[in-house]
Amino acid sequence: MMSKHPHSPSTPQDETPSVPGRRRFMNSAALAGLATVVACTDKGAPAGSAAATGVAATAEEHTVAGLHPKPGQLDTYYGLWSGGHTGDMRVMGMPSGREIHRIPMFVPDALVGWGITNESKKVMGTRPDGRLKYTVGDTHHVHASYKDGNYDGRYAWINDKINSRLGRVRLDYFICDKITELPNVQGFHGIFPDKRDPVDPQINYTTRVFCGGEFAIPLPNTAGIDDPAKYRSLFTCVDAESMEVRWQVLIDGNCDLVATSYDGKLAATNQYNTEMGAHYEDMMSAERDACLFFNVARIEAAVKAGRFKTIGDSKVPVVDGTHAANQDPKTALTAYVSVPKNPHGVNASPDQKYFICAGKLSPTATVIELARVLDWFDGKLAKIDDAIVAEVELGLGPLHTAFDGRGNAYTTLFLDSQIVKWNIDAAIRFHKGDKNAKYVVDRLDVHYQPGHLNASQSETVAADGKFLAVGCKFSKDRFLPVGPLHPENEQFIDISGDKMVLLQDHPIRSEPHDFIIFKRELLHPKQIYSLDDFPLATKDPKQSGVVRNGKKVTVRLTSQAPSYSLREFKLKKGDEVTLILTNLDKVEDLTHGFAIPKYDINFIVNPQETASVTFIADKPGVFWCYCTHFCHALHLEMRSRMIVEA
């Protein structure tokens, strides 16, 4: 049994004896696996209820299903999805679930030439010899910039967990324009932008991005490598505009996901390894972990006052956020709120009042009132745990929470394969002792084992409670079999009424994690570039040609469907060649490709875009450069001869 705590969880009131056979089987299998893990700690598995409330209504029975766009119609929402270990960001249309675009981020992409062109290599980062520094990535969490509590359409950010990088996407062109590698961090997992400045009321938009380091390491990572007790994690703040690291915080425990308050004063991360264990049994040994809060203004004041250190070769200021250094609330930089065992996920409610931590190994969600956290920092609250206003049971394996803007929360239950809809105010009343407060509103079976979820506009003050997307980690029998590797199952749900309605399944290539959904009118994408955006642009085909400077050769050419400005160009074996291509077409959707056989080169240029590649002409002969991206009825004739003389 879990040990008692002043905020011991309350139990749900909606148990019913009916559990569908498939989910009963999956519950049993999942619980058996959990029991094996928990047995390593000599502690029992947390109790909870997973009963379904009955068969869900079908999409055909529900009017909102008619909002699915017909051919030629546009979706009403954008969705930005992480790609997982494909290392990209994906753009979806909602509510159709149609994948519209993939934005290359941390790994090469042969279609667009990401990691091949000089421009993309500059963003990705290279070694001294010009090779890419990294060729793999693992994107988990995507979030966008804010103004006045809603998305402003400027930027989106996404993490790379493998190599601790933060990537930024310009939402006017849907391209990655900057990547920053975080110093002294491994397992960079959760991210979240701030929503306004904590001090200056005129700065009502995002200026910081907070990043959580999940894996503790020696600091620097060359000293004490055999002593896990000395490993530590860092919480990082990155400047939203320059993408430079502003500061870091040394903490006890680790970081998982990240949330920020709407007033800009607080950031937080849930912690599942306050034990700072190096083995998973140790990571589950404590009955309660923490939601760690950061007082942003105080941290930046400490940095400005010089109360920091640096680590290794990094020049980034690092302040002390450990328990020992933050005993006095009136000077503390951090506050550790106790939450049940191994939480997974912390989310900010759109009414700006609460952060909610889901329990994972506890069947509970913990509601933390932000005003009380600020009271503790001001010395007005006796104990930081008094900021907890509810801790209620939801079901087995709660992970992540979304909101509908009507006071309801939606939490994924991994072991139960369910979404539970619950009312926050009712949960608070129930926690205070009102046993008539029915906080569980509805349950819906999903297929199967849901991880992340998000609702339309959920993480803004404009949460509209229309659609919910759920990322199910296992698709099992939902799609045609294609061999051992299954797709993920993204399920879309109508949440506009009292009951949740499952609308559709979508197979998606492994392995997305988090995502956001927002109204399309918040974005104003440009579909044709400006020539002036590119310093290397060749603005007139007459400027095309070959310029030699010793062994270094520059080839300039333009493209206008269906031809390149140079029908052929000559090089000598051993030349270092920089080829610059400008697309002079001004027609939307008229993208050109450029491939050089046997030279491992392919890239595209969109209308009015310029891109370049550099390579060694090490193979003599004739090589037909051709357009790989269909652009004209004479597409196959769009070629140029590269002649390399021996």
Curated annotation (Swiss-Prot):
GO biological processes: denitrification pathway
Q: Where is this region: Disordered?
A: 1-21
> Region COX2-like: what ranges?
551-646
**Pfam entry (one):** nos_propeller
Where Cu cation Z4 binds, per the record, is at H513
Cofactor, how bound (note): Binds 2 calcium ions per subunit. Binds 6 Cu cations per subunit. Each subunit contains 2 copper centers; Cu(A) (binuclear) and Cu(Z) (tetranuclear). Cu(Z) is thought to be the site of nitrous oxide reduction.
Oligomeric state and interaction partners are given as: Homodimer.
Q: Which PANTHER family match?
A: CYTOCHROME C OXIDASE SUBUNIT II, NITROUS-OXIDE REDUCTASE
Protein name, please?
A: Nitrous-oxide reductase
Q: What is the source species?
A: Ralstonia nicotianae (strain ATCC BAA-1114 / GMI1000) (Ralstonia solanacearum)
